[in-house]
Amino acid sequence: TDAGLNFWPLISRLMFPGSLAILAFFLLPSLRHYENRPSAWKWVYVPGALAIAAFIAAFAGMFVPHDPVEFSGQERPLVPVAKNEMQKNWENYGNTPGGSRFVALDQINRNNISELKPAWTFHTGDTPLSPDGNGAEDQQTPLQVGDKVFLCTPHNNVIAVDADSGKPIWKAEINAKSSVWMRCRGLAYFDATQPVPQPTVPGSIPPAPVAAVDAAGCQRRILMNTIDGRLIALNADNGQFCQDFGNKGTVNLLEGMGHAPDPQYVLTSAPTLAGTTVVVGGRISDNVSTDMPGGVIRGYDVVTGQLRWAFDPGNNNPNAVLAAGEHYVRSTPNSWAPMSYDPSMN
């Protein structure tokens, strides 16, 4: 636990407030002088010097071996998974819509994971190149549905791979471009042939209905944000653009953002499927300007791509519908990371 006199937990608790204390000690005489009051430096510099000495000693202590922080709780046993409850798919970035990240399977566990051997290796053809950390990086979490694994590459190319053999099934060449931060962290998946989970919490509003999808259309679809500001829907069966979504498979996410040149607005995290709504945030570049695109969060109909709602944190009415030519409030907080969704409340 982060308590007691163990070195590392102690450092984690005291380093920041200790730094503030040193700053306060040495600023106080100047502040008192500014107010035409006695500086009281004798009462300040001595404890300030002692605090600096303690700070130096603590820093030096980081290079001396210390006892590790041991787990002091009781280890819980592995919970067996009933056969009828074994998970079949990984359909969301974080496994469940809420992002549990844990899978309901127990065949592989901490006792036998060291025995795993690669069954196959697949090369996407999109080579990550990021010597300074701002380039193309493979940071994806694939989706697995049935016998298919769905991948996305740093330039937003999407590939379906056979889960058993590792052989490619289809590839959608998107080849999105950005001057920095080329990466695709994940995808979303929607199956129109399956019932949409309904909320169980009393008073919750059910997911909005969607148009029926023709059997020859995109009944199963992959949804992806791109680094150049698009939301794309692909047929999960063959990789073709879903013609009923947006403009022949694409929604322009730069619409309503105002002045948003590359790379001020880049989408790297997976979109979030919330019932029948695809929710997208976005990355706004840091420390570039005081006039930046807004951090609006938007929800789109998963079948048609039509904008259902927007949450604009800088607007007095955060759900206001934009008129023609208007844009969302500039330089507002953004949601860059993956988001979670609670089906029990929608």
Label every PLM stretch briefly.
Residues R110-I113, A163, A236, V302, ...:
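Inter-blade boundary loops/turns of WD-repeat beta-propellers
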Residues L234-G239, P293-L307, D312:
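Beta-propeller blade signature
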Residues W90-G94, N134-N157, W181-R230, P263-T290, ...:
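Repeat-blade elements of multi-bladed beta-propeller folds
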Residues D106, I159, I232, R298-Y300:
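Conserved hydrophobic/aromatic positions in well-ordered beta-strands
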Residues R37-V44, F55, Q74-E85:
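Extracellular/periplasmic ectodomains of large secreted or surface enzymes and adhesion receptors
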Residues D2-Y34:
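Membrane-embedded alpha-helical segments of integral membrane proteins
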Residues S39-H66:
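Internal/C-terminal transmembrane anchor helices
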Residues S72-G133, K167-A176, Q198-P206, A211, ...:
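Aromatic (tryptophan-biased) beta-strands that constitute blades/sheets of beta-rich domains
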